[in-house]
């Protein structure tokens, strides 16, 4: 194995000091490979190793090279890419053979092209190489004598056995050239067992010295004292590791455990453990580190004292800052073990191990402005700090912000850019950045009222490019950067980039409710789309707007829902359900017209979508409340009686979301059942376990909630009311129990747990009024003892009944083009633990496309019948715009009115987004004609060739079968079967057969025609005889009068048909079950045209053909 690292005590880490090492004994010993970090890959089962440094210039020259070893890393050879472009920076090195047995490698990299005059980088280009070692050692294949036995762990016992493995000798001059097979180990059990063969027994845990000591919580859980009548019990602290194969067990001295110190078995309340901590000052800030290693968190009180806990708040230690108060705590959003505490005296305390240790550094000599840090997504120690320069006072004329850059976690800072108030490491955010070193900054000069957006690829040491001269602000989300730019008439425009270089204006749909683009809120992005709220009413206290969604590059938006509620600060009642695709909950203003006219206050209703905004429905209310009383919604439609929930705009803490990413399908909400949303204090608490399809009222009144053990434990606590109890459920909300956690009632301000909602400990922050000092308290409530065991995890969901794959709710059909099943716990008596359960789902099958897999395209709206129609007075998106973005294209297509939802993976089926006729891109007309024009020369040659063949065949038959036998005149005398024809050889016989066959067909056709003609004449004669005495126009007058009018009518019908076939499609579709593609092309023109011919029309006129025949005749 190859690894990148450094030699030291582990207290410091420097990316620039990383080296590469190799081990060929499973990590037991290591050898130095190279004095740099880079990419590496192996081939031929480890007998070929390739290493490429990240920096091609680390060896002092500009020429790119790679290093390889053919003796398992003992010696290395350098290979210069002599014909290559210099300074190729690698980003991928792979062995394309999946099992690593191949001898070929693919190396991909990038190189920069520079301006010869300024020596500045003009562009980045990619390059790819294939490295082939198949001819190494003169293509010799290894034989049996080239292999050796290798002892795992240097021949020591591992899990009670010694193992050997067959591999190629290190100095063998050959390649194995065989596909990888599962390891075939020679296993020999060890005679005696050692300490490495043992682990702590269930009732014990290891201390800091590695000794197994009793854990009384686990002892109570194991019930060992219940099986003993004595006051103590002897328990062995060690047990043999399961699967260990050593033969002779080690002698273990048991430990005497006093049973009177163990809690007796009783109710569930007595199994739950509560730990209380008191504080003299209120805890204002608290946040967990988002890791699975432990339950570490940082807390900060109102006077600047910081506290650290590593067990979910059970034991809390005050952080020693040597008297310095902490003014701010910032967590690194990209590296979950890192946090920074800013001191009031200019010190910064940083930790990279969840608060177990801290490093102290000095901030730049600048005034702390309280601006948030901006971090690099790829370098843990790189971030930007904002300080005030020349700031004796914030109001000083010379006071301005400066962006300071650190690359060593705050040990040293360099001044990066004056007047910068917000920067982003843009190059680390994009999937395909134009330059990974790019930094973008918003600059606000005190002498100017405007803000500009600038970028640099060298931290503004020399490169400083102005992107926009005047902006309102910008932000990044999901691989996009969106910039708000002021426009004329107090409007805004949004510009989007996905690489940091090319910016495109975001096109918002127009409508009657969108008069001006004055404000918008970016709601986030997910899987190729940006969600955005465009304000349509900015009356204070009555704000609302349209919910929009973009295409994959964020430039074209469509309207998903109208009148979505927002507040004055721009927050929107919009929330995506975590862990599930395409489920969104919003609150809409149902009386928007009257609100816009200031005639009524807002009336909010809650809506939900299960297909990413294409279709919306009101929440289905439960039939009964938590007391068993029926809701009055049985015979009322959902638009008049449904469930409504208070949303994002009313939250005290934005971290308190409806759902949890680990408790799949579960959501809590405070709301009511009725025709509109009631005030918060009049509402109750509701729960869904199937992603919002069905809901249950679980408690009267508003409650705070929290999820534990991936939803295996649910906890509720009353909101805005003093209490001494919580309610909890261990069966996914089916039943609830109350637990008293304290003696005196307190006002619980918040309840939290780890961000992954996987822990069994909950932390409550409460305030006990009228109790003097120590009135601010935390309560850690531990549910670890209420479960019998930990669930046995099986990714297949088959071996045990603890987990199984199942669909969510009743949605067994397709959603986003596939059927998905989730791995969920089935046994309520076990706990899940830190297993990332939300990551385990499977697609049962992909589905055919249906209407639900499409949404309306730009400037199209969804009509009441479900079809997408063009907004009156507007046009669809200009398809030619794509030609500007992709210069290599020669054609574009007009919109069909539909576009596929980015989340959908459907294949086949309905194709509502099918392209219409192509159009040439501007300037590409010639290439377009060449692509679609017919090659007339080739077709003419084929046509002439066919005519010549037919003419030659006809002439040959005439010459050999007709002319030589006397010409056409003789055939009037020849009967079939006559032997008078000349037949000298086989060719003559074949020709004469053809002639006889033609004569036979001619005679039959002639006879049939004569019989038909005679029959028609007899039938016509009978009709004239029957109707000849009736009054009416003569046959000749019909021909000269009315029939000429009918002919004109047929001519008009032909014109109508032409206009019909040229009409555009209205994009409407029938219901899915009734959809038949072939019916769309079924015309009604094959029905006979109505006629004004009177009853006296002679019989022959009855055979006039319908309009469609007339059209064909006229065309002929």
From Swiss-Prot:
Matches recorded under SMART domains: VPS10
Segments passing through the bilayer: 934-957
Top-level taxonomic group: Eukaryota
Protein name: Uncharacterized membrane glycoprotein YNR065C
Compositional bias annotation for Basic and acidic residues: 1073-1083
Glycosylated residue positions: 35, 336, 553, 846, 985
Lineage start: Eukaryota, Fungi, Dikarya, Ascomycota, Saccharomycotina
Presence of the UniProt keyword Membrane in the record: yes
Gene Ontology biological-process entries: Golgi to endosome transport; Golgi to vacuole transport; protein targeting to vacuole
Main subcellular location: membrane
Disordered: annotated segments: 1069-1116
Subcellular location: Membrane
Organism: Saccharomyces cerevisiae (strain ATCC 204508 / S288c) (Baker's yeast)
Biased composition (Polar residues): 1084-1093
